[in-house]
Amino acid sequence: MTGSPAFFKAGHHQLVLGQKTYIAGILNVTPDSFSDGGQFVSLDDALRQAERLIAEGADLLDIGGESTRPGSQKVSVAEEINRIRPVIAQLVSRFSVPISVDTFKADVAEAALSAGATIVNDVTALMGDHRMAEVVARMKAGVILMHNAVLYRRGHPSATIFTNLPTLPESIAEPLRQLDLLAATRAFLALGCQRALEAGVAVEQIILDPGVGFGLLTDESIALMAELEQIQCLPGVRLPLLVGPSRKRFIGELLDRPLDDRAIGTAAAVAASIARGADFVRVHDVDPVAQTTRLCDAILRRCPEARP
């Protein structure tokens, strides 16, 4: 494709694309996240986990202050800010890796960016809060736009279990429901891209995420990963792709593995994603994924840094 960005820009960070796969290590400072809830609520525990993730090979840290797992409880803006702001401030003072904040609330994003984060990971692709695009643009942050089928699949069995996410107006949701999954994914992300670009966010500041596991049945998550290369939304432009398969339900269902035994399945999903064009992966278990990305990059990207 022509006009594709050569790098991803987020604040003062600039990551070259196409030479390696970047790993975003997940750090949830929540009591109820689906996989690691309650483990890193204290500041000391969060900092120790961040140090471990970076030592294992994380290139970025993704900080979450509100769980979006099925059945999770809503958190006020003030509480979400109180959870993440001190952690981000300490991380920025201790480490040089980019910090991402996982939120769909503009006020939370602004507080996180003011504390030193440089990326907003928005699971609603800027459609959960009408102010989010303006905040991202004004603060020159990078943004991850995630396709989220929960927002338009009212009543779908794979979507109703997510109780903590907004829904789209029917004028937007109904046309998306009429499309096949790949087309709906592209159209959803196109809406997010349009909001970003109209607000003044540069193409170089945007990452796309197909949203595997959000409002999707197992075969649908697999289908999106298989068609990852086709998930784009700007004519003539290939935007970088992030995939977040970590410990997801579709891995457990396919492999018949409980939540705490999905590291190998996650690594396999990461390898398949890289082969299909992923530039970033978001995971809990960094060490096995770092080995996976290093080998995949050596083979698929001919990356000299991946070889000893």
Where are these regions (language model features)?
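Catalytic domains of carbohydrate-active enzymes, especially glycoside hydrolases
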Residues: R48-G64, R276
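Active-site-adjacent loop and "lid" segments of alpha/beta metabolic enzymes
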Residues: T2-G3, A10, G18, S35-D44, ...
